[in-house]
Amino acid sequence: TLRMTDPRSTPSTLSSPVSRLSRRAALGLMLGGGASAAIAQGAPAVMRSPLPLPRPDGLHKLSYTSGAELVERARLTGAVSYAVADDTGKILEARGVDVALPPASVAKAVTSIYALEHLGGDFVFTTKVMATGPVVDGKVQGDLILVGSGDPTLDSDALGALAGQLVALGITGITGAFYVDGTALPQIEIIDDQQTEFASYNPSISGLNLNYNRVYFEWKKEGDTFALKMDARARKFAPDVRIASMSVVDRGLPVFDHEAGNAQDVWSVSRSALGKGGARWLPVRLPRLYAGEVFVAVANAQGVELPQALHIAKRAPDTAEHRIVAQHDSQALTKIVKHMLKYSTNLTAEILGLTASGARGLDPQDLY
């Protein structure tokens, strides 16, 4: 199908100040019970209201676990600092505010400077659709090629817009094959082999990337089984994909397991870890074919019939025989860098480094 489109848990208060207050209050009432009863007997009815007095404002906050208690429970022996603020920016609680610590993912700042220096702030990634022949009666007389430049921000909606450009040209199909070209950058299996394989921030890299090379896995409990869904969702388009499959297995650990293949990412998940339902992103190990499958889906949905995507071994040239029929430009590099630093996006950082090195005349084949 194609779709065009915390709660806060309160800690136990058994040992909280609120509970101690209640017990002490109860003890006081018991000790003074006789006097209280005598006074109550002679008091007018209006003074013997069954409604309790209101609690003071902010009393519920006493039941919350403080940050200091959390640090103590975790037995953290190193330098710990934090700051908790509300929506207005008011600091509610802080620890070690004067401790100088390096920011997270500090290497991304260096990568940003490197990319801006060698690519320029106005640099854009361009994704193209190229035809190897003329259009006759709505059909390209030859092949169609989806050519990537490494754009780390390309998503399913951008592919949908590319397909829309084909529609605007009156293209309804092709007589040849449909290829995906991801040769602008080397194919790198995983960003960091020391990280968990199923972490969505640890995908593969190629010259054609999509949705940060992640696939959306969703599950819902249906009786004794689960309904599973794998899709390439963005804001407008969310096509189901077959490039990644999932099965539920009876095991403890690992929660997720992956088997690499030439035509499909085969995943399995522990049944005991699923609960009643949920969703999460998983990394894609076949990004070029992933992008190709999604492009076929969004194109078919708009009336452009394309066959299954195939790899291209050599980069498609810009010649008369390879005519550009659709094109998508990313945002300027300055905006891409800003987004990367805000969300600490690993894929973007690595691609910027590879692309900047290529602009210098280097030919990096890995991340080291």
Predicted regions and their residues:
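A short, well-structured edge-of-sheet supersecondary motif
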Residues: 71-95, 311-312
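N-terminal secretory signal peptides and thylakoid transit peptides that target proteins
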Residues: 6-33
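Short active-site loop at a secondary-structure junction
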Residues: 78, 94-114, 118
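A short acidic/small-residue loop/turn micro-motif
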Residues: 34-40, 98-100
